[in-house]
Design a protein with these regions (language model features):
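Helicase motor core with emphasis on the C-terminal RecA-like subdomain
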Residues: 1-135, 140-143
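Cys/His-rich short segments
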Residues: 140-161
Length: 161
């Protein structure tokens, strides 16, 4: 509901909604489309022809919302993206900055929304701790997660216009 409300606050505008899983990309694209939003899915599990067609529609048409995993975005240079929403916690601060940086490249205002909850943080911590990485790598990943959460919990936007 929060994603739908955010997208509906930008009628006729192009945007990207990032999801952590292919399943969520598909589900969100369907639910947004059912609400009248021109939403298209994009993830590595789709046929290349479908990915290409959806990417072309996003690049060439106004008002298209791409629901996508991080597989979407490299080489995308659409200047009038008005919003980026993370329906799940981004991978890290660097990925977050790269992904939100796809909005407002034309110099006009753009919005971002990042949704996450306690379950997201717990899952990420569990993934770090149960991973096969060295203790040093796990320490670094815990620091990166802490930095991401600090950014997400900051009381102000990174940059306001």
């Amino acid at each position: 509901r929060q994603v739908l409300a955010f997208v509906q606050a930008h009628p006729g505008e192009s945007g990207i909604v990032y999801c952590a899983s292919r399943r969520k990309v598909e589900e969100l694209a369907r639910s947004l489309a059912a609400a009248g939003v021109r939403a298209l899915p994009y993830h590595a599990g789709l046929e290349k022809s479908v990915r290409d067609a959806n990417q072309d529609a996003f690049q060439q048409e106004d008002g298209v919302v791409m629901t996508a995993t991080v597989a979407f975005g490299m080489g995308i240079d659409k200047p009038d993206v008005r919003f980026v929403c993370h329906a799940d916690l981004p991978a890290n601060v660097e990925a977050y900055y790269q992904e939100i940086g796809r909005a407002g490249r034309d110099g006009l205002p753009a919005d971002t929304l990042t949704l996450y909850g306690l379950g997201d943080m717990q899952l990420r911590r569990l993934q770090i701790e149960q991973g096969d990485s060295s203790d040093e790598r796990k320490r670094i990943e815990r620091q990166r997660l802490g930095a991401l959460l600090s950014l997400a919990e900051a009381p102000r936007c990174r940059r306001q216009t």
